[in-house]
Design a protein with these regions (language model features):
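Non-catalytic alpha-helical scaffolds and adjoining flexible linkers that form interface surfaces
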Residues: 1-21, 26-234
Length: 234
């Protein structure tokens, strides 16, 4: 029996039968893994309390199919303290990973970014900056990184002082007649996106708009539950 052990975070959990849970973990070395946690709902208090989101775990599991079996879960850190809107932001990050990651596809750099993002959401004065950085890293990891330097049609360099139109899954091109201004970005905003410089509030808003547009196609037009929770809490 092959046993694996990885650092991991819980992305999603749900009840299974009378005493167990189904878990989706984000593991440092192997990406997203689905497991059954037997007795996870009715075991000892220590066992039940271990399976908490936003806690770095050491996950040991076994199995050959798509659904593995938890052997043990051990908390390596305390739960990242998240309350109010910051909790909804962290739930949003988890939902993106749960929805978009392919099963058992390694993405070490993204794991580190995810861990840093949780800490930034909890502690930073402006957690929106961490969210935008995470979204851009996620797009790159999934193979949908955008060229922020060249016009996708002419090949010319994008310049400050001009406006450009964004085309999903492609990139930017010189602005044409368009009714939806939400897809228009200035050269200055695009350059700041490329450098991940969100110090300008207008750039931070533009980054939020861009990331939402870039992720929309990957999500298949299906709404995010965490986004609805966040909107309802305002």
């Amino acid at each position: 029996m092959s046993i694996e052990c990885h650092n991991a975070f819980i992305l999603h959990r749900r009840p299974y039968r009378e005493t167990s849970q189904l878990l989706d973990l984000f593991c440092q070395d192997v990406g997203k893994v689905s497991l059954i946690f037997k007795g996870g709902r009715s075991g000892t208090r220590m066992r039940r309390g271990t399976a908490q989101p936003f806690t770095l775990l050491q996950a040991t599991y076994f199995g050959r199919g798509q659904l593995k079996t938890v052997k043990s879960l051990e908390a390596k850190t305390q739960v990242v303290p998240l309350v109010g809107n910051r909790l909804y932001m962290a739930m949003y990050v988890n939902e993106l990973l749960y929805r978009l990651l392919q099963a058992e596809t390694a993405c070490d750099g993204l794991f580190n970014t995810y861990q840093d993002t949780l800490i930034s959401i909890a502690r930073d004065e402006c957690p929106q900056t961490a969210l935008r950085n995470f979204e851009l890293t996620l797009l790159e990891t999934l193979g949908y990184g955008v060229n922020f330097e060249q016009d996708i049609y002419s090949g010319e360099l994008l310049e400050c002082g001009f406006e450009y139109q964004y085309q999903q899954q492609a990139g930017f091109f010189a602005k044409q007649a368009i009714h939806n201004k939400q897809h228009i970005y200035t050269g200055e905003q695009i350059q700041a996106l490329s450098e991940r410089d969100f110090s300008n509030p207008e750039v931070l808003l533009a980054a939020k708009r861009f990331c939402r547009q870039a992720l929309a196609h990957l999500l298949g037009g299906k709404p995010l539950h965490s986004r609805a929770l966040f909107s309802g809490a305002k």
